[in-house]
């Protein structure tokens, strides 16, 4: 079996991949994550997932390289990582009592053959109606400034959701394991 490499510095993705009980290494790719003019959110996450994997291919020959990228989309607009309390509060206020779709791009690159499988896995959450006090309590408790849309679903962020809809709940955290297993099997990896 080729060695697995997770092209990410995300501890959330690392924890998810560890669930598969396959040995893997992690390396953070250095790419430009800018949104291109006219690029749809769906196309953006697929491109970035692929570019993250490709950025490490020359350093890791003989590897299966996993790239992933996620955005939250509200009314057609991308909600990126907020980075600040103020921006996170704005995002959550806008998302109150709406549906937010998380798009997770996934790429599996075989650095030996150059073959790259790419997909986008959607997951939708219906947000509770949130008042400013509950938003601020959540932000102070969870500090989700490195999470798309200010949602840290693997923690207290789940309390913001009224309901969820999607084929793979792990995509909400940033690495759709069901789809990844399909890709790994196609590459001849035995899971479990």
Swiss-Prot record:
One cellular component term from this protein's GO annotations in UniProt: cytoplasm
Pfam families: Maf
Highest taxon listed in the record's lineage: Bacteria
Names of required cofactors: a divalent metal cation
Localization (cell): Cytoplasm
Known function: Nucleoside triphosphate pyrophosphatase that hydrolyzes 7-methyl-GTP (m(7)GTP). May have a dual role in cell division arrest and in preventing the incorporation of modified nucleotides into cellular nucleic acids.
Protein known as: 7-methyl-GTP pyrophosphatase
Organism: Pseudomonas syringae pv. tomato (strain ATCC BAA-871 / DC3000)
Lineage of the species this protein comes from: Bacteria, Pseudomonadati, Pseudomonadota, Gammaproteobacteria, Pseudomonadales
């Amino acid at each position: 079996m080729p060695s697995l490499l997770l092209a990410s510095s995300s501890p959330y993705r690392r924890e998810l991949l560890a669930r598969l009980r396959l040995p893997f290494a992690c390396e953070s790719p250095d790419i430009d994550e800018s949104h291109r003019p006219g690029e749809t959110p769906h196309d953006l996450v697929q491109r970035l997932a692929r570019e993250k994997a490709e950025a490490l291919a020359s350093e890791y020959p003989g590897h299966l390289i996993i790239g992933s990228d996620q955005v939250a989309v509200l009314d057609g607009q991308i909600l990126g990582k907020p980075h600040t309390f103020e921006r996170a509060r704005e995002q959550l206020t806008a998302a109150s009592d709406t549906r937010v779709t998380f798009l997770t791009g996934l790429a599996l690159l075989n650095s030996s053959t150059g073959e790259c499988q790419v997909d986008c896995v959607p997951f939708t959450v219906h947000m509770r109606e949130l008042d400013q006090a509950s938003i601020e309590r959540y932000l102070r408790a969870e500090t989700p400034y490195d999470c798309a849309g200010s949602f840290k679903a693997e923690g207290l962020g789940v309390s913001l959701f009224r309901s969820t809809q999607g084929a793979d709940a792990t995509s909400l955290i940033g690495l759709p394991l069901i789809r990844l297993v399909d890709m790994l099997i196609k590459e001849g990896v035995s899971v479990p």
